[in-house]
Amino acid sequence: IVPNHAYQACWNAIEFIAKRWGAKVIVIDIPFIIEEEDQIIELILTAITERTKLALIDTVTSPTGMRMPFERLVTEIQNRGIDVLLDAAHGPGIVPLNLEKLDVAYMTGNCHKWLCTPKGSAFLHIREDRKSLIKPLNISHGYSADLNAQEKFRFEFDWTGTQDPTPWLCIPKAIGSLGSKVTGGWPEILERNRKLAIYGRKLMCEALGSEPSTPESMVTSLAAAEISSKMKKKDENLQYDPLHTSLFDDYGIQIPVWHWPHHNTRYIRLSAALYNGEEEYQYLAQALTDSL
């Protein structure tokens, strides 16, 4: 099962594997506007059947910037004997992640987004009882190694060919360095950025005349707002939305503006990091007002 807020590349991978093995992908329609997280829980759990084998769940959705109730979903789904693949591309650095407590079957997340590590740095976690089932895309020397499950897992995934491991090696230092920028460490960073995203979303919604898409409890360092139908829409022949181009060219603002076909909704998504301040969202709101 795949919620329709899933990142398209991951969704495509699920579709590809399902087609190869004759499986069926069940897409769960979750609205763009959510009143409470229980809506999501109910929609996903209702879609599960006795034939369900795997659920792709996000920590925070990339297209729509919504914090999924992933902790509850992992517990509820896996208690039904179904494995969860937790997509934490937007996870490290914006939500607390406790691998032991989550006990999720599979989890992968990027570090270059919110931990400020080099591109190509990420992590893959596979629960101990699932390690022997998973192989890397490239089969190399580790495949024939006579090792225990953990050693074989590391050998197979660490050595898939000639590569530069520098981005991976930067992760521990980046976590420590960024966490030392404020006295409260990472808990303070997460809460500070969340409050800033909520503040920015409020200004953005006021400028656009739209309603918040989720309650504040479902906001992390990402937040999205629907764009009024009054604003000039993207020409299908153009690669970028005209509002995105205008904000970048005329105001020096880089912010995603998308039309999400699964909701037939056009929206804008902001992010809030330690280097951002309230004045930047005020500037964005004014730019949006001028663009109406």
Question: What are the language-model segments listed below?
Answer:
Residues 1-292:
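Pyridoxal 5′-phosphate
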